[in-house]
């Protein structure tokens, strides 16, 4: 089976539209590539980032970075927002999943481990995001747990 233009194959999809196995592989590949390469991905040519007003959540104030990706980088959406804690770690990552009808998501990376001097979140939870920017606590849309991270 082949999917020559995977992104175009999602035209007209909503969150409820079923995906083929190849569409799932495309999305999972884009998602994990983005998740594992941030913040280094931000150094790529054509990506723009601008600090915007801070955000209060869970008794903390997080700095926010509005990021715009060029068309040549396959990712969830052109416009994304990163939330950075006082320790410099990514606390939240917002995006609208363009291939699923621009479904808004609030992604929470946590449980960081250090591998060869680089911090990686081993737990990721993604929830629907409301119009006011606040996450819904249910339903849990995506759950990712990583272990045994090795850099070669």
Describe every region a protein language model picked out.
Residues 2-73:
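Flexible, processing/modification-adjacent segments and terminal tails
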Residues 1-2, 82:
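Broad, structure-driven detector of short, well-ordered beta-strand segments within folded domains
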Residues 60-152:
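Gly/Pro-enriched, hydrophobic low-complexity segments
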């Amino acid at each position: 089976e082949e999917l020559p233009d995977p992104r175009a194959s999602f035209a007209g999809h909503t969150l409820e539209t079923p995906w083929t196995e190849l569409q799932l592989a495309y999305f999972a590949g884009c998602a994990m590539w983005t998740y594992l390469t941030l913040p280094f991905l931000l150094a790529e040519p054509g990506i723009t980032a601008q600090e915007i007003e801070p955000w209060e959540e869970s008794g903390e104030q997080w700095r926010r970075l509005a990021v715009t990706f060029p068309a040549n980088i396959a990712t969830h959406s052109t416009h994304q927002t990163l939330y950075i804690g006082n320790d410099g770690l990514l606390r939240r990552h917002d995006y609208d999943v363009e291939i699923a009808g621009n479904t808004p998501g609030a992604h929470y990376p946590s449980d960081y481990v250090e591998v060869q001097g680089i911090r990686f979140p081993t737990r990721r939870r993604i929830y629907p995001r409301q119009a006011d920017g606040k996450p819904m606590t249910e339903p849990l849309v995506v759950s990712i747990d990583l272990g045994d991270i090795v850099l070669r």
